[in-house]
Amino acid sequence: MKKMLIILTIAMSVLPAMAGRPKIGLALGGGGAKGAAEVGVLKVLEEAGIHVDYIAGSSIGSIVGGLYAAGYSASELETMFRTQEWLSLLTDRKASLNNEPFKTIDGVTYVFGFPVIDRNSRGFGVMSGGRIEQVIDSMVSVKGCTDFESLKIPFRCVTTDIRTANEVILSKGVLCKALRASMAIPGIFKPVEHNGRLLVDGGMLNNLPVDVCRQMGADIVIAVDLQQSEQQPRKKSDINAISGIADLFGLGGILEWITNRPDISKYYENRKQADIYIHPDLPDADASSFGNKNAARMILAGTAAARKLLPDLRALISNTSQSVSAPM
């Protein structure tokens, strides 16, 4: 009886604080290897004792966000970025062919183990992304979170339906497949089939999903933007990488996408709507800057950018807490 009273007393003391605390959402943008900077932001939030209630991610942001939602700490994610052989994972490199200058297997040509994309072939990409999907599945299985429903933190994964050019937000089902879809760059990776849809990189339409966090119920949204220039949601040179989608969109659809660039207008709107906008300084990094040294440098950049805005975040949490707990 005495033990029960102690538990009830503790619960009653904690509930008012929880009720008055604003819900914090974290919007993690895409940017390939630059996603390591997002790990630096998570490290600062953990050190400051700031709990994240909702996460939305696009492309590499979905990988970081999904694994964090599954229970991986920032320190564990740092180890992953610094030690994982990302190039082999992402390119489906066959280690058994490392010493083979040219080898064709099942219609795919490999150069020293790396699959080569035939620029004249029609299709969406030669790389299946199977290896990265397997690794993610193994990682989330260790934490007991193979699907969205079992995650420790509510999470949304942003993808693009390549047939309709519509944004698709995944919130249930198999986690590893959703994460694979969100980082499937058209023309490089094969799309993921999901409930009758063909899904690819969410960054094509929403590379900074602040709006998704807001829809989840966040009072405060922290956005981590990995873009490094004012007009960079998708560089002009990246258009070559999406040429494969012409098979389903049609040439007219591709030209319309390139002309209207719906991702840019949404990107700037989401930037404006973010309560805390974190923009790590990564001038010499690009989406392929994997490796231990690069990861370490980008994690530090994310840490520095987050620490700079930590006082603003604390003040916002304090002010919002007073607003949330104030009597009606």
For the regions a protein language model found, what residue spans apply to each?
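Sec-dependent N-terminal signal peptides
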Residues: 4-15
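Patatin-like phospholipase
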Residues: 18-58, 66-328
